[in-house]
Amino acid sequence: PEAAQPALSGINLEIQPGEFVLICGASGCGKSTLLRQCKPALSQHGEKSGAIYFNGKAIEELSFREQSEKIGFVMQDPEMQIVTDKVRHELAFGLESLGTDNRKMRVRIAEMASFFGIRDWFDSPVSALSGGQKQLLCLAAVTVMQPQLLLLDEPTSQLDPIAAGEFFNTLKRINSELGTTVIITEHRLENLFPMVDRVVFMRSGSIVSNCSPADAAEKLRGDDEFFSVLPSSVRI
């Protein structure tokens, strides 16, 4: 709040329903700050200017219920997000908080358990899960709310490469099969790059490039910071 320079500056970004968008950049570039502005309940304090609209409505005007139902958020550390001790309780927590009908809740939970392939550990304690399973549980617990927009802040930062790849594949299924709009910040680009529709590169709180993965190499060829982190298949 007392920083001399704004955390974000000159941001102009429009995302269409059903898009899969990757936001990347060095630590401190503002990507996580930007992501959190899309869910007011999680946005940072401080002076703000500009406006964000969700389905034509100023995002600050969304009720807590609308935010909870329509905008999902997955954090870096699953331990900071999981609130119950059992897998099935975690899947039910959000729906119970909104007073969802019991029958509807059971149907949704069963569908998500099947979709995410977690039926084998549905009755397990959360403490028995691996890091990858815990993050998958966080994703499932958010998706069971049937959000229109899914925000993910470096969700694979604590996962090994195999678990990260599986997580990305599940995320792509959510986007393509459920039609959910996905915005993700990530530092692992190799597997994720071919899956997304658009890549947004940020530096010092501003967007420096906003393009398709196919155009990224050409647009960033003279930018050593970003060109060097592109997947090798794109740089060729």
Where are these regions (language model features)?
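Catalytic Walker B motif of ABC-type/P-loop ATPase nucleotide-binding domains
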Residues: L150-D153
